[in-house]
A protein has these predicted regions:
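Acidic-and-aromatic substrate-binding clefts and catalytic sites of carbohydrate-active enzymes
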Residues: 56-62, 89, 127-133, 156-163, ...
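Active-site gating/metal-coordination segments in enzymes
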Residues: 77, 83-209, 216
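Mid-to-C-terminal alpha-helical segments outside catalytic/metal-binding sites
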Residues: 2-41, 45, 54-78, 106-114, ...
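Aromatic-lined glycan-binding groove of carbohydrate-active enzymes
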Residues: 223-259
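Short, glycine/acidic-enriched loop or turn micro-motifs at the edges of active sites
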Residues: 47-49, 185, 299
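Aromatic-anchored helix/helix-loop segment that forms the rim or "lid"
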Residues: 251-280
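Hydrophobic faces of well-ordered beta-strands that scaffold small-molecule active sites
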Residues: 43-47, 79-81, 121-123, 149-151, ...
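Short acidic/histidine-rich active-site segments
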Residues: 182-183, 227-238, 269-271, 285-304
């Protein structure tokens, strides 16, 4: 290297990297978090409640009032409540799992009934149990008046696009259901990772789920389901090109307009995925009208998502739509 020793270059580069990391850490820890700016407040499509059941996940002190106070603090006008990480209990395929889901949905519906202008319900399903899921969809929509459905990205050795689940998809399509897909570490890749390592598997499994919907024709056969992929699409925005190039030749009937057109039917919420580099990839991949606001509260602090939004690569009009307007189209009862 001309004029600079290799050792000096490495030391200088390391120092610069350390400084950049320190600056980033300082910003993360100390930058004031601003409320959303959307008129009427944002709509949070990824917001968890903690049901009164054994092993419930989330803040043990959670109440609807806790959510409402946090929402008021950050100008969030409405939140769609869904279940969080208890897939093994809910997807056991047993009568007990059906009863557990029913208890959770009844509790979530009571929270909504007490705060109908602020809260909505994405009802859970005993998804591994097809007949139980069909009964729960009927109950959740016709009795509880839910706003949509929440499912997990995989169960056992199956992902939601598997033909085994077609009867469920047919009914969700008939209902024109918004469906939030919450990731879980799949059985195939749950290797007892040390703390912090399994986090990536959530995003990888969300991407496997999207592939499953694609190659099994769910996105084509059931176009009225509004699937919502969490955390900005997982790793899908950066993997989609490889997925496109490796699409099976014997399944071309499911991509009449190509792979990109199918993936662009999906919606993408940005809870804990609002870093600029993530959103740059998402903006190239998905139309801004398909991007939704979410927080992953209570497992994740609302500040985690809001802190990064000032750096988002969207115009003010696009951010307004992401914060509220896009979700109003999926959940019209919250329309101003």
């Amino acid at each position: 290297m001309s004029g600079v020793s290799r050792r000096t270059f490495i030391k200088t580069g390391a120092a610069a990297a350390a400084f950049a990391m320190a600056q980033d850490s300082s910003r993360d820890n100390h930058t004031p978090v601003q409320p959303l700016t959307a008129k009427g407040g944002g709509i949070d499509v990824h917001h968890h409640f903690r049901p009164p059941i054994p092993g419930a996940v989330g803040d043990p002190k959670w109440t609807p009032q806790m959510s409402l106070e946090a929402m008021d603090k950050f100008n969030i006008g409405a939140a769609l409540l869904s279940l969080t990480m208890q897939r093994e209990q809910f997807y056991a395929g047993t009568p007990e799992a059906r009863a557990l889901i029913r208890t959770c949905n009844d509790f979530g519906a009571k929270c909504v009934q007490a705060n109908p202008k602020r809260l909505g319900l994405l009802a859970g399903l005993p998804f591994a149990d097809v007949d139980g899921s069909l009964k729960e969809i009927e109950y959740a929509y016709d009795t509880l008046k839910c706003d949509g459905i929440g499912i997990y990205s995989s169960t056992g050795d199956k992902w939601p696009g598997d033909p085994f689940f077609d009867p469920i998809m047919q009914e969700l399509n008939r209902r024109k259901a918004p469906v939030l897909i919450h990731a879980a570490v799949p059985n195939c890749c749950n290797r007892g990772f040390p703390p912090g390592i399994s986090t990536g598997e959530l995003d990888f499994d969300e991407t496997r789920c999207a592939q499953s919907l694609l190659v099994n024709g769910v996105l084509t056969k059931y176009p009225d389901i509004k699937f919502i992929i969490f955390h900005g699409g997982g790793v899908l925005p950066v993997m989609a090109g490889r997925i496109k190039d490796r699409y099976p030749n014997d399944r071309k009937q499911w991509i009449p307009n190509g792979v990109w057109a199918e993936f662009r039917k999906l919606y993408y919420e940005i809870a804990h995925g609002s870093w600029r580099q993530n959103l740059l990839a998402l903006k190239e991949f998905a139309d801004p009208s398909r991007v939704l606001f979410g927080t992953d509260f209570t497992p994740e602090a609302i500040e985690t998502t809001l802190r990064e939004l000032p750096n988002a690569p969207y115009t003010l009009a696009e951010l307004q739509a992401i914060e509220r307007d896009n979700a109003e189209k999926l959940f019209p009862r919250f329309k101003l």
